[in-house]
């Protein structure tokens, strides 16, 4: 198991390192293209890549700590670091999109209030869109391949793959739409071409903001200590019940939490007979091995008690 964890961490590190430098290149390219083309959409794209670059650095450090054994200063290990990372990563992405909406809205307001709006330069946009979409597609495939090789358990790789898809969608959508704006000249929409990129930004934001919002809601539930998904809980409880039956113990219930790729399971049981500490340890080891196969990496605690550990309403 330790060898597998080391291999998975190596795969994750390699994928994140490639993503880090790719995003740094895309950040500079996006900001340079925004300056050359006077496009807010390109600026948003560049800022999004800059956030991805900074996040990749943090993700690599956090990924190396996940799964380490508890210490005196971190008695519960580092597993929740991954959840914290994904939570704040989602918040930052939401913040970038909100900032982009504000910039686009300001440009539209300036236009309709009679202010001056700079004319777009379309030349640099075409080259940028082709190069960046190709890079984002490659990154998304690289992250997803690493995600599968690590057993589909890394929330970091899953989040980065989604971020690469969003970045590619931003580049493709904004690039294609911006390049189509000159064709509106001479039509009823011709007078609005100067704010075309601002409108495109707002449409793209409405299309993709649901992804970081959904991720934020999921990780917030993990941080709040809400029970793991029903399917995961059912598998853990079934495994605990089976092992308890084999040992002749009475199974009360299992409490299951999820922290990124790690699961936390507490099993409440009543041996209904005198037991030694090493027998409880043997039960824990047998169940831990079974849970590892059923639901993935697990930290397990066993509570020997006559009750199920739940608060019951007073009669």
Q: Where are the regions a protein language model picked out?
A:
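The first (N-terminal) embedded transmembrane alpha-helix
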Residues: 17-30, 101
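Short, hydrophobic transmembrane alpha-helix segments
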Residues: 32-45
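Alpha-helical transmembrane segments and adjacent TM-loop junctions that form the membrane-embedded core
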Residues: 2-5, 11-18, 41, 55-65, ...
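Generic low-polarity alpha-helical segments
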Residues: 30, 35, 298-300
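Active-site cores that bind ATP or allylic diphosphates and position pyrophosphate for catalysis
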Residues: 48
């Amino acid at each position: 198991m330790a060898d597998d964890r080391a291999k998975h961490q190596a795969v994750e590190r390699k994928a994140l390192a490639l993503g880090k430098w790719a995003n740094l290149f895309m950040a500079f390219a996006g900001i340079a293209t925004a300056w050359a083309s006077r496009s807010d959409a390109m600026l948003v794209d560049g800022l999004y890549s800059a956030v991805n670059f900074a996040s990749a650095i943090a993700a690599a450090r956090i990924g190396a700590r996940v799964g380490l054994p508890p210490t005196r200063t971190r008695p519960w290990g580092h597993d929740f670091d991954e959840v914290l990372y994904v939570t704040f990563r989602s918040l930052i992405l939401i913040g970038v999109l909100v900032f982009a909406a504000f910039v686009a809205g300001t440009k539209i307001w300036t236009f309709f209030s009679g202010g001056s709006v700079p004319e777009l330069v379309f030349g640099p946009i075409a080259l940028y869109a082709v190069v960046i979409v190709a890079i984002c597609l490659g990154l998304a495939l690289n992250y997803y391949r690493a995600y599968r090789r690590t057993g589909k358990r890394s929330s970091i790789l899953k989040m980065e793959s989604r971020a690469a898809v969003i970045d590619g969608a931003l580049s493709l959508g904004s690039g294609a739409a911006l390049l189509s704006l000159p064709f509106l000249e001479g039509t009823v929409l011709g007078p609005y071409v100067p704010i075309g990129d601002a409108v495109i930004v707002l449409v793209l934001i409405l299309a993709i903001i649901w992804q970081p919002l959904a991720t934020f809601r999921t990780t917030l539930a993990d941080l709040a200590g809400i029970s793991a998904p029903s399917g995961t809980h059912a598998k853990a409880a079934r495994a605990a019940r089976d092992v308890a039956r084999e040992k002749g113990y009475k199974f009360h219930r299992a409490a299951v939490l999820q922290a990124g790729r790690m699961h936390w399971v507490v099993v409440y049981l009543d041996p209904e007979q005198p037991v030694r500490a090493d027998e409880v340890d043997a039960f824990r080891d047998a169940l831990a091995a079974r849970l590892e196969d059923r639901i993935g990496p697990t930290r397990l605690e066993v509570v020997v008690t006559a009750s199920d550990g739940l608060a019951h309403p007073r009669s």
